[in-house]
Amino acid sequence: MATTTDALTSAPVYQTGLLANAPDNLDAKISSEIHAFDHEPSLDEDGLLRPTEEERTTLRRISGSIPWTAYMICLIEFAERASYYGCQFVFSNFVQFPLPKGGNGAGATPKGTQLTPGALGKGLTVSSALGLLFKFLAYTVPVFGGWLADTKLGRFKTICIGVFVFGVAHLVLVLGALPSVLQAGHGMAPFVIGILILALGAGLFKSNVSPMLLDQDTQKGLIVKTLPDGERVILDPEVTAQKLALAFYGMVNVGAFFGLATTYSEKRVGFWLAYGLPMVLYLLLPILLWAINKRLVKYPPQGSDLGKFFRVIGTSLRRNGLKKFGRKGYLDAAKPSVLAAEGTTGEHNGKPVDWDDNFVEDVKRSLEACTIFLFFPIYILNDGGIGNITTSQGSAMVTNDAPNDILNNFNALTVIVTIPILSYGVYPLLRRHKIHFGPIKRITFGFLIAAVSSAIGAITQWRIYETSPCGYYATGCEIGTGVAPLSIWWQLPQWMIGGISECFCNVTALELAYSRAPANMKGLVTSMYLFATALSAAIAQACTPSLVDPYLIWPYVAPAVLGTLMAIWFYFLYRHLDDDEYVRGGVGDTLGEVPTVERRESIRTGDAIQEFRPNEKV
């Protein structure tokens, strides 16, 4: 079997001075040699068959095998998200509304009324502010959690610490929601303490669980396999990652659907039960973690590449200046090969660089992913509304003894139904017909339909204003029934369309965060995606003073318009990435672009993916 060296040395070589006598078909002969190389199968270091260039573009791609530990991690995510969302879904009513008149003193409402469950009675502005503070912290702490796992503790230990903190938070929330505490007016302090601790635990957990899941797939690069029916296919880690991410996000929303139990608990029994049920489900977490501990593929902390990451950017800034930042090839100035070609081997002042050319490519991909995540805050505002505005909107509609926050759960239910359709129906069908519905197209589509969700919210709010007994001051109305003659089920399209958008945006973002990050920064880059939610919460926090009647239509209209314009800009800015055949951190070449011989050999021998193989498993 010919190697790269064989292919090159077997081609005719002509000295510079004899080029005039070279045969006319020189280019054709060299092209023929490389073409022959392209079509020769090769084995990787594990003896697995790698595809030729022709096979890479013609064979159908499928998922590789998925270990059972990956499914157990998805189950762990279910338990954590169920306990998290089970609490979060009732935060709004707990803070905004007072204890209902004629209720049981635990926050539940009398039967047969249109009253809303409540406890503290602080109003929409305070409720939204505290909810956004919680969300901001829960999605800011992951930045620290990702760094801690990458550099100090590893993913598993960091997750275990987060789970312990999570348990303390659940206990504080339950104690603060006891009827005796609420009736004495002392519920605010334990609630605030509880959500702060809950945000810390969730942040440590969330930034590391999806990278740990994707760590369980140990296949690196493309592999050719013959199926029992004789069809030759490519086992593609990108497809495997997509399937894992879909399963993971599906379990996130199965857990979120647990909010259905807590919303009915607050309505019928009280908040002590609404917070107590998530705590019971939380108890599954330490048991499941103990069960899979010795079976997991664990990557030890190897020190974050964050320092090198910034030194690469700093070197490029010094050599290229700020004006050209972001242009194609900007970071190439930091490549050791470029520095050597220009007669220098130092970063600056003769100090040798401690990275290679491949790491600079990793930095490029990571920066692209992080800039993509900057578009997500506006999308998140469209997916569920600003603050607690949509839950508050439901309180001004006819509920007929249903909780006003029940429809939150239909977002999760929609995701649960949509993910299998995409995973086992739509995406395989597209791949079978060689239709590449790339990550940028998926995210753009999600952005657009989320904007539609906000537009529907604006129409619903307008109808409430037009039909409410209090007109354009419908929130907290006490005239007549106090609600507009509109069923709360008018909100259903908002939640369902938002759920569909998440299947395209959030799932794809998880894939990008993991696949485009350097090996020692995967937790940190994943946390950058999560931090987009924190930025969204900060934007929403700035908007909370405007969440008052008669202006509640505009918090839906503005994100819808911005989201539509942003989606168009986003697609034209990043559409080239749909042709980028990234495979788990960059192994692969641009689709349709013939890679260099050196790059092909690097891929086939595994050189380009050595950084992804840890020195040990612990």
Describe each model-derived feature in a short phrase:
Residues 2-6, 10-11, 17-111, 118-223, ...:
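Hydrophobic transmembrane alpha-helices of multi-pass solute transporters/permeases
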Residues 32, 229-232:
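Acidic, serine/threonine- and proline/glycine-rich intrinsically disordered low-complexity regions
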Residues 225-227:
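Membrane-interface alpha-helices at helix entry/exit sites of multi-pass transporters
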